[in-house]
């Protein structure tokens, strides 16, 4: 790894207090140095580049104007908060971003007092910040609370729930809207700047609030008329600005747009509005990838580009040899094949078309692929509506995000028996994104839902088979879970075949011990079985394929043959696949010795998947050791 050294100013910033000791005219240099440092680190330690570069200026401004950590900053998603981490005492640790034993790629309260609320998922910042603001007011504190949310996260319903509730409280809540994708129409530039200056002036706001408050106290104006005057005031502003503003419809004062990449202007505006009473929103226009030309020109590619050469802008590639495809691409190609067969086949994704390869369908059949925004619950119910009218939706959602649509899976899909295929991408441990993004809970919370099928393929062929079966061989709700990244087969384009629901298969016959696995982790288990065979241990291996319903015929046979069973899953062992096996054995009065291998009852940190497997005792060496211990002590 290249030696990375921060430069002049930021080398002496170990806390926001150090930042606030600088002169305002030094802040642009701080921003340049932060961008340079982020580029140098991320070129060799992959992370979220584009959003972090775009957020540098307003991050510096927030820590310069507000008294953090007493004042709270709540980050939505948090992948844009790299400069925040650098400024809050983690400059050196930043070199080990998203690594095992290093710092998280997202804000984490366990890591720093400046990380006020855990982040990773979208649209929750306003609700969390509002709760903090209300609590601070209840304790008669003067703390200011700031929520930082992107325009993408504003597509999530929870953000609007927070906005709606915020209007009920007079607390000093500031919402920073980081708009880097033109999601909100542009305001008039010169007039808008004038309006921001006027509306943020101390004189204007003091007179405005004191007048209404005083009039009410001396009963010269009723509450109704006071509100009417406020409406008149808002209408007058709208007339001047030639627009009607969504946020002020929530009774939240709106300022902007402001150039979110002009740190001096941001300091000026933040100082003007920070002491205003009531909830308010500051709309910032930022450029994703700001300061690095390749990232500015291709925002999607440079969101998380992997390793790259800073000077040339070329992303580093692996060796030029045949490799298995990503499970995501197999899903994308197979979905297009099914869509070629049947015009009823459609795709749905909540804002992850590139990540899940829904883009393949979008390119060929743009009118049959729907990106519904960051709205997982809506995506599920939208799919149920499509199915109700005879379409066959493949709803692709990351496993960690289906948690946000659990009620809809039960109420709107399973209860009605809708022919919806839910494909859970990034199931299992996911590596560097860490605890907020692991897809380890889905098997536990889905297997208790009636009238739903849950399956996980061993490899790419099985994924294609299950997708065909979900489309043609089963007319109810079905969940297919598969991991992030590459599969195991280079020759993966098989002709898909229908598979029987609730039917597993024996991969290796054996006598001494039985392994039961589900999903791609079975490939690692198979290698363990082969290593045991080299040592003279006859181990059997069964790929169960279906979590729900289980292959009970196969389980009866296993229970009658083996005294010792090891279940292996890439998911939480509490209530997961292994628990399902144990429940079956108990229900049928079988008493084998069972050991469950999976994710233990704790949150697993960031790092590589092999490191996470080893930490959880799910790697090949741990399985070998466990097997030998069980056989030595029957």
Swiss-Prot record:
One function term, GO molecular function aspect: magnesium ion binding
Single GO cellular component term: cytosol
InterPro entries in UniProt: Dxylulose-5-P_synthase, THDP-binding, Transketo_C/PFOR_II, Transketolase-like_Pyr-bd, Transketolase_BS, Transketolase_C
Binding positions (thiamine diphosphate): 79, 120-122, 152-153, 180, 292, 376
Essential cofactor(s): Mg(2+); thiamine diphosphate
Pathway where it operates: Metabolic intermediate biosynthesis; 1-deoxy-D-xylulose 5-phosphate biosynthesis; 1-deoxy-D-xylulose 5-phosphate from D-glyceraldehyde 3-phosphate and pyruvate: step 1/1
Catalytic activity of the protein: D-glyceraldehyde 3-phosphate + pyruvate + H(+) = 1-deoxy-D-xylulose 5-phosphate + CO2
GO biological process, one term: 1-deoxy-D-xylulose 5-phosphate biosynthetic process
Entry's cofactor comment: Binds 1 Mg(2+) ion per subunit.
Binding site for Mg(2+): 151, 180
Keywords recorded for this protein, A-Z: Isoprene biosynthesis, Magnesium, Metal-binding, Thiamine biosynthesis, Thiamine pyrophosphate, Transferase
Superkingdom per UniProt: Bacteria
EC number per UniProt: 2.2.1.7
Family listed: Belongs to the transketolase family. DXPS subfamily.
HAMAP family: DXP_synth (MF_00315)
Quaternary structure note: Homodimer.
Function summary: Catalyzes the acyloin condensation reaction between C atoms 2 and 3 of pyruvate and glyceraldehyde 3-phosphate to yield 1-deoxy-D-xylulose-5-phosphate (DXP).
Annotated protein name in UniProt: 1-deoxy-D-xylulose-5-phosphate synthase
UniProt source species: Porphyromonas gingivalis (strain ATCC BAA-308 / W83)
Taxonomic placement: Bacteria, Pseudomonadati, Bacteroidota, Bacteroidia, Bacteroidales
